[in-house]
């Protein structure tokens, strides 16, 4: 297996077969629009070159998905070696189904799909549409070579007029280059509260997001607050989260400062993971049923992390 991306370790680059620095500069310039903390999804992250550098340069959480063992094992090592305490790694091969399901429950500020859509089965333009639905901003790099993998996808990719051409990335195939595009859109509603929630449980929350602020409000209560960068802990588990490790998350739960008032509903789906940090949400929700005291509930979440079964 080739070293596709370069490795980035504490400010130094070890070159892989793909040029990365120039492509990162395109991404970095685009990300400068954010005047707030933001969340990145890096689909097919490989060695996490772009995400690791984004976390160095900006106040962001980056969620990196990779399915190849050589790559995700090295990815987790690199995230740790660079001290990226806002890094999240999935061991997951994205499909159209998993992209669609992810968009039902999560919202990302910046989605990176760098030379990846031709590796995903199915109609490539449907794949692009599903990736667009994941957040406000999407950057995509498109393969075009006759000897690239996934020729059916390569030859049928259509980039619409609503995409902005940002530049080109030098390919690893012969002397060709690949076009890099960006697209912006706004989404305010979710289809589900969390993965696996009971059918008929209405999401009931609204997102207001721009480059300067991001807030969440609720249909059934008066609370409105800043969006917490990261993803739901249930999403992390469902998509094969391997970094931070379970041991690290258990330690975070044990050391977590107790809420000022009893929460009453500490469950996996009421926790947001922002890398090494975990944040409780939905305290004092008038619609929830108090299940047990908070200390026992935290023990229940710790057991769930290792077993995948919620029994508190």
Where are these regions (language model features)?
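Conserved structural core of kinase catalytic domains
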Residues: 216-247
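Conserved beta-strand signature within the Rossmann-like core of class I S-adenosyl-L-methionine
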Residues: 135-146
């Amino acid at each position: 297996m080739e070293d596709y991306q370069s490795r980035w370790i504490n400010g130094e680059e070890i070159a892989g077969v793909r040029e990365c620095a120039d492509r990162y500069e395109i991404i970095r310039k685009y990300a400068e629009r954010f005047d707030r903390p933001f969340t990145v999804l890096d689909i097919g992250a490989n060695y996490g070159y772009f995400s690791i550098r984004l976390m160095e340069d900006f106040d962001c959480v980056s969620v990196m998905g990779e399915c190849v063992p050589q790559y995700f094992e090295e990815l987790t090592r690199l995230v740790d070696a660079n001290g990226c305490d806002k890094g999240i790694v999935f061991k997951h091969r994205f499909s159209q189904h998993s992209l669609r399901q992810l968009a039902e429950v999560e919202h990302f500020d910046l989605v990176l799909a760098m030379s990846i859509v031709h590796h995903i089965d199915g109609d490539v333009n449907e794949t692009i549409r599903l990736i667009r639905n994941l957040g406000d901003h999407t950057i995509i790099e498109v393969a075009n070579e006759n000897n690239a993998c996934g020729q059916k996808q390569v030859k049928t990719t259509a980039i619409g007029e609503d995409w902005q051409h940002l530049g080109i990335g030098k390919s690893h195939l012969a002397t060709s280059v690949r076009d890099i595009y960006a697209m912006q859109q706004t989404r305010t509603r979710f289809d589900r509260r969390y993965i696996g929630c009971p059918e008929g449980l209405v999401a009931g929350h609204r997102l207001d997001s721009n480059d300067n602020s991001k807030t969440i409000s609720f249909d059934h209560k008066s609370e409105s607050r800043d969006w917490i960068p990261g993803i739901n802990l249930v999403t992390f588990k469902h998509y094969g989260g391997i970094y931070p490790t379970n041991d690290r998350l258990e330690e975070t739960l044990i050391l977590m400062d107790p809420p000022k008032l009893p929460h009453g509903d500490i469950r996996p789906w009421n926790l947001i993971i922002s890398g090494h940090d975990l944040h409780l949400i939905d305290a004092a929700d008038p619609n929830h049923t108090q299940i047990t005291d908070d200390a026992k509930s935290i023990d229940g979440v710790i057991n769930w992390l290792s077993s995948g079964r919620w029994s508190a």
